[in-house]
Every structure is written in C-alpha cells, then in structure tokens.
From Swiss-Prot:
Residues 56-78 are annotated as: Disordered. It comes from Ehrlichia ruminantium (strain Gardel). It comes from the Bacteria. This is Large ribosomal subunit protein uL4. One of the primary rRNA binding proteins, this protein initially binds near the 5'-end of the 23S rRNA. It is important during the early stages of 50S assembly. It makes multiple contacts with different domains of the 23S rRNA in the assembled 50S subunit and ribosome. Forms part of the polypeptide exit tunnel. Part of the 50S ribosomal subunit. One of its GO terms (biological process) is translation. InterPro entries: Ribosomal_uL4 (IPR002136), Ribosomal_uL4-like (IPR013005), Ribosomal_uL4_dom_sf (IPR023574). The gene is rplD. GO terms for cellular component: ribonucleoprotein complex; ribosome. Signal peptide: none annotated.
Length: 205
C-alpha cells in the first residue's frame, strides 16, 4: 500500500510502502479497550490510604469494664464504630499495574495505526529535524490539514523542533520507542517519520 511522503513544507517528495499487516488490520475495539485500560492502570499512583486500627492514634485502654454497665461491650476507642476510629477494608497503598500479553499489546498498536490510516488521519513525514526554532513554520505545516490535534512520532528530534512545538498546545512530540495506543487515540492526526515506519515494521512483525 503506497502513500505519499511529505516534508515540513507539506510538499510531496516521494512515496512509501506501508505494510498491510500493520496499517490495514481489522478494527478491534475490544483490543483497544484492553490496551488502553492496561496503560492507564500502569500510570495510576495508587497512593490512596486510610488508617487501620493499628494506625489510628489514641489510647489502647479498654474504655470501661466488660460487664454490668448496661452498655455494649467495647475493647477499644479506636474501633470503627467510634468517631475518629479506624476504617475497615479501606484502600491501601498499592500498584494497579498488571501484565498484558505482548501479542495483545502489539495487536492494539496495529489496530490503532490502522484506524488512523483508514480515516485518512495518518501522515508520513520525511524528517522532523529543523535547524532553527520557528514555531510559525510548524504552525503553517499543521494548518494545511483539518485536524484538531497532532502527534508527531520520530526516531529523535533536535532542540529546534522541540522548541518550535513547545508553545503549540495541540502538537505533541513523541520518540518512536514510546509509541503507544493511548497517545495515538488521544490525538486526531498521527504523523510518522520514514524512520519510524521502518522501526514499527521491525518491532511489530
């Protein structure tokens, strides 16, 4: 499957073959859901915590004698039924991460890239290196396409490109080693460099 390769001036400078095993995979919303949930679970801090009866400060003395008071027996003022007492079965500090099969993760990436390609929201760029800082040039480039947000994925990017995109809220730069399903779906248009296409073919095939 041949698609056009463009430069930073939005000019067609050639063509590239996209492997249909990566860029023309059947749409699988169930796989996308699994991979996105896996990614977001790994990002969770898991710092939620409530105090158990061993964490609550206060006396450990029995509040009153066991019998002959006419009241229910109590062993501690730190028990959950008292104001300021412990929380039973509350959240604890933990990791929410879990493992997901590598084949499923790779399939999710293929489905996400194929989805963008089928919607004409996938562009191939020759290079993302610019030798100067000029936000206006990047702005002119993205204005040629009627998309809301852009994810630019490349092998690496220099300071010129980084600072040129820094002030654009709808443009995100990402190194190819960090290509992931969540960021692809979160942006309207995905821009890959020629090097990134070759990298993805080696990674996913």
């Amino acid at each position: 499957m041949e698609v056009n390769v463009i430069n930073i001036e939005s000019q067609n400078i050639g063509k590239i073959d996209l492997n249909p095993l990566i860029f023309s995979v059947n749409y699988r919303p169930d796989i996308l859901k699994m991979v996105v949930e896996w990614q977001l679970s790994k990002r969770r801090v898991g710092a939620h915590k409530t105090k158990t009866i061993g964490d609550v400060s206060g006396t450990t003395a029995k509040p009153y004698r066991q019998k002959h008071t006419g009241r229910a027996r109590q062993g501690s003022l730190r028990s959950p039924q008292f104001r300021g007492g412990a929380v039973i079965f509350g959240p604890v500090v933990r990791s929410h991460a879990y493992s997901l099969n590598k084949k499923v993760r790779n399939l999710g990436l293929k489905v996400a890239l194929s989805l963008k390609n089928s919607c004409n929201k996938l562009l191939i760029l020759d290079s993302i290196d610019v030798n100067f800082v000029k936000t206006a040039q990047v702005l002119r480039f993205i204005k040629n396409f009627e998309h809301q947000s852009f994810l630019i994925i490349g092998k690496d990017y220099n300071k010129g490109m980084m600072y040129s995109c820094k002030n654009l809220h709808n443009v995100t730069l990402l190194k190819q080693i960090g290509t992931n399903v969540f960021d692809i779906l979160r942006h309207d248009c995905v821009i890959l460099t020629v090097d990134t296409v070759k990298y993805l073919e080696d990674r996913l095939l």
